[in-house]
């Protein structure tokens, strides 16, 4: 077989690529949204997908097939007889005959179709119990093509058993994807988890529940009873539209509807359920459905042939069905059932919109499927905070976030969130990767800012590596690792301290010996350099003296400059006879020959060496060199002294390096007690405080006249709370803009079944009676007849967010002061003060980005934050404005579709409508320019009918605070505080070290007074590592203190000023293989009590506590350290034996 040419190979490759592209286009996604917690009795889950159009000739061979692992119900897979009802132009019309109502005819025939949504009785009702899934499809057809819509309904338990599978219809493949949302049991609407509870509107006031607009999918079920009119569904529609006298509509059945993505079945009609009545009324108004066409046909045209009638079934002697014949883009369902027959007669009418007007009596049909919308009350699921933790993995970190009730929002500026998620019960977990650990990892999850300290990850890796290396003694290795793996200078100080303790007796003489050798070599070089320099200076002096007395020292023959007189005399004798003055070898008596010889002669320095030897010989054994050479670095006294001094200095450095950096917000490690301020003048504080930060100020106010009189002063400012009086404007809706052309060839403009006439928001313009030949298709040659109807309407409405308008704003902080025994609290507003006889605390002003009349838009839960709109239309809204389509409790508010229609004509073509107004919804415009709007985050929101309160977690707002304490205090009365505080340590959890933190539980007893505002600290013997403000009441109080810091020997106690609990508790060691993030909002605390910083005595106390902690801890560690110390001393003794005493050396 010959080789293929390059052209053939290229064509073959192109063919394969085209085949793959075609296969990809035939794959469609059907998404099934499931809550992530599945319980019994939660009904059915439903989904649908619109497939591409297919030729009408293929419909009769269509078969819905499945490769899914769930059990499909076979009731919809069987063949069912349909009356195919079509229209066409009469064949006997002469050429150029003007179109009229008699130009068209209909035909009826019987066909068998499989897989359509003909659901028998009790199939849906028993699907959940029998674990059966229902798959079917519906058809929307014109004369040439049909567009299928596939529906899938199944028990909600399939969300557990199935993740993905394939369905097929003809040559189209349908990828069914079961996606678990972050909702526990609700449905995802507007980005929030909504549980529709229809009974809430009947039993609770309106401000206690929310109302959402949800999609409804309904399927016709035939149920025939032998007597009565209870199942004659058409009679319910006729009663609803107040139509009387219709007696021939005997079809019996009902609609079974599913609300949203999952629900219990809803029966329509049902007298005891107002949801059923709402759906029934919407069916009566929009008999073909409220979802008019697929999105890709948003701008399309149709040509209406006119009203037609036909026979169903085809064997009927007279017409039993009527409708409107059209050509162009398919709209509504083309399948239905005749209402006049007792036994169901199914009709498939491609290119005909069947009659659905319930205000007439005859020739009506009901659609097999109906899609619409309904507003329902319900409750929004409560959200919980996320827990985020990370582990080191390669150059980055692997992180995981989980929440008990689902994660509705997660993002990170430093990590890649890939949404790989899993569920365990009601928990949702998401894994992601952070590429960099050179900076702290920040994650926003469920409205909270989480920060993972990456230095603690590195510490954990250090502990793991150290323990792995010394795995033979893991207990000792881990205990040493948690001491050594400390970041910064503190860690290096710990390492040096342990090295000095264990190996100092070997390292000190070794390092001293090396340093001495280096110093001796340096001293020798310096002395040698000084000797050579002096010799060169001597030679220069000799040369200058000779030149002054005798003249030039340049040889007249070889022109060489000599340095001594003997050298010049030798040149004069030898150079003139052609001999070298240095080596005495013969040469030419010329300048060039002699100079060339001097370059290779090895004895040119002979006269300088003779002069050097005549001088005193250098003896490098005096002064510094001799002292260094005789230094006894192996002396036990020297080594022991240096060892002790180094241990003391390193302990001081270790304790001093443990202090943290001073920060504006957050805890700063201080010693016990609080600061003292002599009240010589008024005490004034003036500062700016971030909105998310609380502030604690504590001092002892001292009487300048009597230093023994001190008054405890405590000031507590809580976080800023934003109070907004709001007006609930409703729910903002998104919609698809539709532009339709409906052309009618003959007659005047009649109100045919145009799709926009049942839409909630539409405008229409009719161009009646064509006046020129240039605006008619070939088969409509008439002039002065016909109609072009242009319609613009909004379809596929979807609720996207809640909207609130700010009526008024207040910024408040709760201020509490304790001055001696006097305690006062007040919630202070902007430009307001808390005033007592001695203290004045004012909130002077607030820098804010919110203003009254601003509009707040929430596209999800309140905790997710929102957007601020300065301009929001409320009265006259145009399509495309913010707030253009609103769903309110009083109904839908439609925008003005501003613009003008234009009819585009061309000779012998159908007219097409054009619209020159805006075609993009306000929501889509907002999403395209979302970054241009101000955003805000929300923490701890509280909402009611007319008020919204929250805390700003980003510190984007700031308050100006002014505090004045008068110097005219009654020290005699206030300094004598009868309150007695006793402290006891109850429990502790967490770990010591700055990265992890601990939680200390204290029991604080207050006696002798009813209430007392103060701060309780978590301290060890030397320093304090955390504090909390507590308003103590008489009796026992349980106080939780969160702190960070300490060391392995820290016994954390509960302290008040200088008084501490009698016992302390030791926290766990920091096992930092996984580091959990902390809430940034929880750490936004500014604490200032003026306590002194840790000094020399504090350092020694801290070091001593650490040493005692090591000794009282893992005894194996102490044993290993002592053994290493003994071994180093023995090694020192062997390498540096004791020198014999002087007397023994000179003993006679």
Curated annotation (Swiss-Prot):
Cystines in this chain: 34-159, 68-165, 117-136, 141-146, 183-193, 218-257, 386-445, 390-399, 415-434, 462-485, 745-780, 749-787, 761-894, 775-905, 790-913, 816-825, 833-842, 873-877, 979-1009, 1002-1054, 1019-1024, 1055-1060, 1094-1098
Protein name (database record): Envelopment polyprotein
Lumenal domain ranges by topology: 24-495, 659-1114
Superkingdom, taxonomy of origin: Viruses
Taxonomic lineage: Viruses, Riboviria, Orthornavirae, Negarnaviricota, Polyploviricotina
Residues that carry a glycan: 142, 357, 409, 937
GO cellular component: host cell endoplasmic reticulum membrane; host cell Golgi membrane; host cell mitochondrion; host cell surface; membrane; virion membrane
Alphabetical list of PROSITE patterns matching this protein: ITAM_2
Species for this entry: Puumala virus (strain K27)
Zinc fingers typed CCHC-type, residue spans: 555-575, 580-601
């Amino acid at each position: 077989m010959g080789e293929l040419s390059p052209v053939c190979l290229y064509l073959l490759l192109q063919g394969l690529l085209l085949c793959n592209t075609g296969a990809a286009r035939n794959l469609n996604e059907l998404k099934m949204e499931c809550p992530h917690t599945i319980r019994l009795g939660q009904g059915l889950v439903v989904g649908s997908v619109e497939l591409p159009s297919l030729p009408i000739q293929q419909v009769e061979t269509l078969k819905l097939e499945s490769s899914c692992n769930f059990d499909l119900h076979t009731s919809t897979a069987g063949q069912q007889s349909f009356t195919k009802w079509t229209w066409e132009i009469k064949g006997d019309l002469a050429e150029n005959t003007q179109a009229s109502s008699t130009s068209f005819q209909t035909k009826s025939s019987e066909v068998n179709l499989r897989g359509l949504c003909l659901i028998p009785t009790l199939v849906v009702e028993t699907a959940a119990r029998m674990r059966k899934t229902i798959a079917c499809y519906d058809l929307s057809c014109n004369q040439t093509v049909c567009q299928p819509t596939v529906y899938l309904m199944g028990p909600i338990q399939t969300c557990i058993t199935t993740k993905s599978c394939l369905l097929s219809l003809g040559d189209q493949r349908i990828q069914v994807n079961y996606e678990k949302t972050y909702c526990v049991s609700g449905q995802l609407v507007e980005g929030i988890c909504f549980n529709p509870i229809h009974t809430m509107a009947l039993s609770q006031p309106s401000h206690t529940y929310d109302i959402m607009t949800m999609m409804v999918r309904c399927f016709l079920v035939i149920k025939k009873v032998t007597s009565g009119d209870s199942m004659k569904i058409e009679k319910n529609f006729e009663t609803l539209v107040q139509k009387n006298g219709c007696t021939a509509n005997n079809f019996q059945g009902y609609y079974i509807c599913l609300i949203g993505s999952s629900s219990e079945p809803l029966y329509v009609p049902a007298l005891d359920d107002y949801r059923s009545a709402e759906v029934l009324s919407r069916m009566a108004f929009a008999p073909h459905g409220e979802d008019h066409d697929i999105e890709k046909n948003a701008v399309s045209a149709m040509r209406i042939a006119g009203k037609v009638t036909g026979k169903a079934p085809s064997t009927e002697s007279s017409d039993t069905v009527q409708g409107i014949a059209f050509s162009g883009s398919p709209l509504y369902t083309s399948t239905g059932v005749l209402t006049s027959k007792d036994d169901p007669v199914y009709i498939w009418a491609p290119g005909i919109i069947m009659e659905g007007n319930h205000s007439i009596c005859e020739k009506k049909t009901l659609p097999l499927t109906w899609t619409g919308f309904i507003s329902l009350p319900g409750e929004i699921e409560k959200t919980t905070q996320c827990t985020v933790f990370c582990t080191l993995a390669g150059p980055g970190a692997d992180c995981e976030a989980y929440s008990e009730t689902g994660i509705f929002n997660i993002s990170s500026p430093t990590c890649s969130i890939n949404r790989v998620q899993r569920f365990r019960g009601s928990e949702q977990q998401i894994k992601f990767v952070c590429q960099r650990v050179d900076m702290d990892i920040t994650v926003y999850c469920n409205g909270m800012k989480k920060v993972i300290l990456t230095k603690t990850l590195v510490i954990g890796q250090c502990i793991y590596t150290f323990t792995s290396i010394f795995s033979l003694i893991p207990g000792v290795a881990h205990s040493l690792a948690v001491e050594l793996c400390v970041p910064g200078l503190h860690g290096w100080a710990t390492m040096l301290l342990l090295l000095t303790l264990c190996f100092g007796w070997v390292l000190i003489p070794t390092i001293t010996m090396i340093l001495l050798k280096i110093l001796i070599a340096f001293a020798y070089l310096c002395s040698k350099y000084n000797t050579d320099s002096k010799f060169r200076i001597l030679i220069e002096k000799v040369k200058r003296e000779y030149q002054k007395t005798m003249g030039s020292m340049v040889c007249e023959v070889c022109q060489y400059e000599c340095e001594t007189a003997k050298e010049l005399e030798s040149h004069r004798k030898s150079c003139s006879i052609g001999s070298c003055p240095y080596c005495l070898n013969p040469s030419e008596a010329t300048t060039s020959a002699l100079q060339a010889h001097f370059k290779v002669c090895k004895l040119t320095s002979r006269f300088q060496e003779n002069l050097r030897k005549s001088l005193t010989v250098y003896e490098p054994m005096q002064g510094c060199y001799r002292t260094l050479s005789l230094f006894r670095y192996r002396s036990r006294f020297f080594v022991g002294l240096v060892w002790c001094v180094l241990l003391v200095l390193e302990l001081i450095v270790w304790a001093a390096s443990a202090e943290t950096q001073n920060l504006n917000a957050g805890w700063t490690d201080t010693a016990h007690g609080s600061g003292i301020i002599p009240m010589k003048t008024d005490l004034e504080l003036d500062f700016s405080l971030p909105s998310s930060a609380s502030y604690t100020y504590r001092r002892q106010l001292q009487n300048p006249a009597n230093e023994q009189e001190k008054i405890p002063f405590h000031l507590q400012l809580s976080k800023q709370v934003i109070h907004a009086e709001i007006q609930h404007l409703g729910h903002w809706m998104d919609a698809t803009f539709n532009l339709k052309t409906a052309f009618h060839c003959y007659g005047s403009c009649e109100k045919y079944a145009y799709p926009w006439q049942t839409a909630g928001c539409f405008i229409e313009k009719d161009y009646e009676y064509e006046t020129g030949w240039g605006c008619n298709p070939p088969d409509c040659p008439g002039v002065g007849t016909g109609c072009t109807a242009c319609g613009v309407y909004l379809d596929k409405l979807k609720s996207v967010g809640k909207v609130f308008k700010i009526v008024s704003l207040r910024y408040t902080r709760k201020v509490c002061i304790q001055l001696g025994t006097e305690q006062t609290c007040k919630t202070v507003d902007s430009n307001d003060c808390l005033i007592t006889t001695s203290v004045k605390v004012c909130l002077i002003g607030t820098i804010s980005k919110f203003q009254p009349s601003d509009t707040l838009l929430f596209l999800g839960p309140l905790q997710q934050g929102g957007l601020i709109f300065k301009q929001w239309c409320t009265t006259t809204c145009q399509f495309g404005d913010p707030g253009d389509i609103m769903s309110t409790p009083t109904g839908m508010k439609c925008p003005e579709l501003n613009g003008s229609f234009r009819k585009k004509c061309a000779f012998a073509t159908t007219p097409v409508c054009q619209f020159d107004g805006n075609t993009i919804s306000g929501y889509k415009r907002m999403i395209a320019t979302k970054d241009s709007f101000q955003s805000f985050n929300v923490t701890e929101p509280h909402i009611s009918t007319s008020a919204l309160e929250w805390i700003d977690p980003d510190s984007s707002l700031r308050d100006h605070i002014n505090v004045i304490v008068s110097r005219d205090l009654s020290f005699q009365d206030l300094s004598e505080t009868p309150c007695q505080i006793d402290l006891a340590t109850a429990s502790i959890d967490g770990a010591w070290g700055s990265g992890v933190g601990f939680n200390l539980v204290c029991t604080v007893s207050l006696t002798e007074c009813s209430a007392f505002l103060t701060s309780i600290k978590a301290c060890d013997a030397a320093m304090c590592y955390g504090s909390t403000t507590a308003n103590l009441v008489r009796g026992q109080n349980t106080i939780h203190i969160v702190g960070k810091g300490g060391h392995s020997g820290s016994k954390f106690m509960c302290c008040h000023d200088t008084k501490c609990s009698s016992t302390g508790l030791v926290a766990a060691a920091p096992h930092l293989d996984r580091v959990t993030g902390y809430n940034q909002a929880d750490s936004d605390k500014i604490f200032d009590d003026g306590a002194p910083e840790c000094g020399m005595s504090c350092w020694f106390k801290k070091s001593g506590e650490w040493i005692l902690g090591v000794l009282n801890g893992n005894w194996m560690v102490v044993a290993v350290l002592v053994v290493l110390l003994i071994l180093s001393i023995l090694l020192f003794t062997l390498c540096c034996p004791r020198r014999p005493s002087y007397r023994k050396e000179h003993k006679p």
